[in-house]
């Protein structure tokens, strides 16, 4: 199966491309390299012996999308491309709506024009807003507490409407919880450009000496230790979830919605301690004010994905932290420049 992977040079996209190749699929990557580096391609080749086709283009460039879909005889699309920082989205809402919402509409329009009717969308647990309770099932009410989450929710609503109007399409919405970890070889990992917005790359950059200390946003949440609780999922498990979605429902007409999480919640301080165990170092941190748009706790009920896709997260907290440290210690400055 030939699959266009938008944002395939990014953190989750690159790991998913490896799992797709292992499953016998052919990923074709389209990415504008806004938050990634072209050297990712060499790492993918090093790990699995195959160098995917790479197209440098923006998802808002319809002509480039149409050409990619046609020339490569694409059968399905996995759509990762988008901006993804909660804090930045509060400062730059228009950029988030343009990239994430408008970009998706341009992509779907290009798919419609070329007759490609299978889409897997990289959504997020942020669409649940501040949930009334945990664990979270797929039928929970959706809302948003920040423009990033709202952009994901708007895309979900657009795709839901589009699938109703085009019932022969297969559209899958994968609501991720908090991806962490790296490829077990240490060849690929999370390499944010600039100051990390996510917990694990920040912790690992402190441990490797790139940053002085970790800022823990909020220590007065109604949780076990006052810090935010999240469902951290290994990026390799998440990647397997995309492959399972393509294999099980990618050619089945309908709207398919799945949580991809572990069903367990860990606090920020628990993650710091687990990382300290993995790297054998202290990770200095300071407690600071809450971030706007953050919530107290959030974890998944992943049973629907298990029942319908046969998918279950299996990698442990020790693997999440150990694999992250292997990546960061092997690549203290992240991916090299091309």
Please report, for each region that a protein language model flagged, where it lies by residue.
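Short, flexible, glycine-rich and Lys/Arg-enriched loop motifs at helix boundaries
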Residues: 38, 167, 178-198, 209-230
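Generic, ordered loop/turn and secondary-structure boundary motif
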Residues: 128-129, 137, 143, 149, ...
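Pocket-edge positions in alpha/beta enzyme catalytic cores
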Residues: 57, 69, 96, 191-195, ...
């Amino acid at each position: 199966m030939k699959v266009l992977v938008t944002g395939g040079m990014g953190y989750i996209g690159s790991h998913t491309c490896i799992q797709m190749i292992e499953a016998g699929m052919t990923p074709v990557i389209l990415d504008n390299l806004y938050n990634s580096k072209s050297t990712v391609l060499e790492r993918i080749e090093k790990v699995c012996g195959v160098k995917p086709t790479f197209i440098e283009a923006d998802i808002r460039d319809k002509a480039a999308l149409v050409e990619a879909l046609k020339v490569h005889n694409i059968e399905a699309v996995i759509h990762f491309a988008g901006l993804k920082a909660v804090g930045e989205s509060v400062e730059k809402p228009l950029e988030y709506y343009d990239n994430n919402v408008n970009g998706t509409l341009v992509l779907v329009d290009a798919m419609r024009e070329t007759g490609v009717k299978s889409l897997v969308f990289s959504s997020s647990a942020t669409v649940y807003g501040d949930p009334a309770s945990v664990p979270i099932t797929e039928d929970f009410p959706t809302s948003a507490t920040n423009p990033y989450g709202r952009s994901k929710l708007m895309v979900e609503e657009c795709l839901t409407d589009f699938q109703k109007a085009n019932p022969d399409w297969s559209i899958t919405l994968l609501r991720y919880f908090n991806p962490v970890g790296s490829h077990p070889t240490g060849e690929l990992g999370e390499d944010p450009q600039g100051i990390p917005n996510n917990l694990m790359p920040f912790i690992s950059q402190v441990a490797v000496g790139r940053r002085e200390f970790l800022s823990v946003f909020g220590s007065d949440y109604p949780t076990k230790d006052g810090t935010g609780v999240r469902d951290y999922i290994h990026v390799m498990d998440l990647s397997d979830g995309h492959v399972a979605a393509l294999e099980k429902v990618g050619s089945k007409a309908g709207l398919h919605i799945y949580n991809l999480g572990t069903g367990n919640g860990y606090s920020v301080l628990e993650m710091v301690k687990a990382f300290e165990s993995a790297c054998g170092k202290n990770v200095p941190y300071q407690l600071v004010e809450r971030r706007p748009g953050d919530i107290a706790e959030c974890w998944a009920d992943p049973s629907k994905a298990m029942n319908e896709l046969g998918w279950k997260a299996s990698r442990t907290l020790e693997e999440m932290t150990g694999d992250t440290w292997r990546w960061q210690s092997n690549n203290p400055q992240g991916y090299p420049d091309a």
